[in-house]
Amino acid sequence: MATGRGRLRTFAAQPGECSETVNAGIQSLYLTPPIRPKRNVCIECMPSEVLLKIFSYLDAVSLLSLGCVNKRFYELANDNGIWLKLYSSSLHPKWTIRKMKSKHTETVSLGCAALHDKKPGYWKKEYIIKQVSAFKTRVMRLVKFLDPYTGLPCKNKEAMKVSGLSWIIVLKDKNGKEHVVEKSNLSFKDTSLTILWYDTDWPCLDILSTLKLFGVTPLLPDQCRPPSKNGPRRFSLMAEYHLANLTESSVAVGADELVQLFSLNPGLLVGIWKVKNEIAFVMANLHYNQLLERSILGSATVQYAPPPNKPLLDDVDSEYGLHDYSLHLDLHGRNCMYLCGTFKCLFCRKRDIENGYLRLRVVNLKDNRKHLPIIGTLGICWETDVFKGNVKDCFVMDLTLLDETGKPFWCFSAPVRMELSAKSSGLYDYMGHIYTADYVDSEGKVSVEFVWLEETKEYIIVSLVLYVSTKKLTVAFNLHNRSEFSSYHLCDQTW
């Protein structure tokens, strides 16, 4: 060691060197204590008791989000003590233990029995069930406000705002991989809502198998402002469509220079790029009839099922179910309205019931006083991030047929194409080409005839006929045992 110190002194004594600085640096190697690395402190390393104390200050949405971090957080965020406190604080202030039903007596008690007799997560589940039930009740109250002309809910926008409701589509490919598309544009009409989804990164059409439409709401909407797609949400399945062999299995609605339109029941329109044969956009047309119920009350795997109809049999009226229908009809192209009309006192004679249909003639070819002019040139507007267009000779039809009590009897919103008819107009008032438009679903069909007036550059509806399935009629009006209807083929027929 002495030799070592001597060498240090000799080195420090060399002329021209910074001896004092060097010696000070060397001495610091011996005098300075070693620096120990600081221990990383993170929330995951905290004791469970401390974490539970922190979690007890969080709201329900934050607790649900924490439960998705890892297994330990999930178990701690299920703590019955925390959720029982949230459940109790959510009760009406006037409620007391004695006023509550026996089922809920133990839910307010903060004693050991209410905590230890239940499995972890019990009170979380009870809290969520209670909040979701109260939310559904509050939203469904808004459905009861009806438009006197259409018989449909008139506070849909308010209900959407209260519930945080939105709609998404989920595309599933043949390998089982799902692609979620949330970005959308909404267009509200008198009786329907049109939703347009467009994206720059659609999956290849050839590998897609299904498309599912969901209504999406925050799990706890009162505590999510604004609603976040990363927060806990509820999904309500509204429709499922099969996309395999789309161009062969669906109905071609029309085309322009860029896209082709294909229709799938109920109410879906898929735009395909002509050049790439890939999806350009997806458009859903949703009728207001039971829209909120279908968007909220279903589950992620099962669609909402309306309660069974309980018709009353009228033994006095021999033509019960054949008269006093009302029709509200809208024709539009998503952004523009072409026709909005209401027709009252529609009826059908018994002799007009044939081939499994009840015929309701709305516009008669021979009665030119009821012919309807169309505003503008018929077409459906579409858009993406880059392009916009208008496919001509097609439109969206919103049909609302009310029965004699003013309740919705048959409703739909769907794209319809026009076709040039081979026959020429036999009307002296209108000389021009005739176009037809037909719609068919499981409940009936619609047939429309237009005449194109070259002089005024407009369409005129000269014929409009509804055909309602007699099977739907017998179920809705309980006509199974009516002998006077049995001879008029009130049975289900193939179209």
Where are these regions (language model features)?
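Short hydrophobic alpha-helical "box" of cullin-RING ligase substrate receptors
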Residues: 45-59, 63-77, 83
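Substrate-receptor adaptors of ubiquitin E3 ligases
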Residues: 2-36, 41, 81-495
